[in-house]
Amino acid sequence: MKKLILTCALMTFGLMAFAQSLNTLTAKEKKAGFQLLFDGKTLAGWHTYNKPGVIGNCWTVEDGVISFDMTKKERGDLITDAEFENYDFSVEWRISKNGNSGIIFNVTEDLKYGSTYNTGPEMQVLDNDGHPDGKIFNHRSGDLYDLIKSSSEPVKPVGEWNTARIVCNRGLLQQYLNGVKVVETRYDDANWKTMIAGSKFKNMPAFGINMKGRIALQDHGNPVWFRNIKIKKL
């Protein structure tokens, strides 16, 4: 019985310690210059795309996690108040069964652009096995959506947390999924323009031309969760 009580106590302590470590920076991260983009309690620093100062009720915070609820009426991508140029960004995400979402970056916010993807490239978030997009070779989790297929697929099963990392540094883009680099390309050269011309974004003249912009969490109509959102200016 004593062993059981001790085991339960250790498990409880471990869970409490883990919860306390969510949405925080380590001493090493602080020294390196990282900053939190999500405080774990509020959506301060974020708003609904093209609605400055407004956060749709589809986005809520519970237990240190940003949650998307597709049943709510006030919809739209959640986007940072600030713009970033040359940065190291990371976020943990969890997708629902058959779900689809994404992390869209270098976004220009302007009423003439109806969606974040009119200007910003996307790192795909997907249930590869359950969503129809999983059958499209460059629409799977970790892909640079509709542009570059991931070099490998270290994605975890639906319901588990994944870590996405996007590094934009003076024209060089690197995407990491669960610590593995899965995409590397330049976003300032002729090859980039050629890729766009061969993609579904070819008729969007403002797509992929920004060297800086906002970062968005996509409302694609399916439940999705985000936490531990951090960025470092390079």
Residue locations for each model-derived region?
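Bacterial Sec-dependent N-terminal signal peptides
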Residues: M1-S21
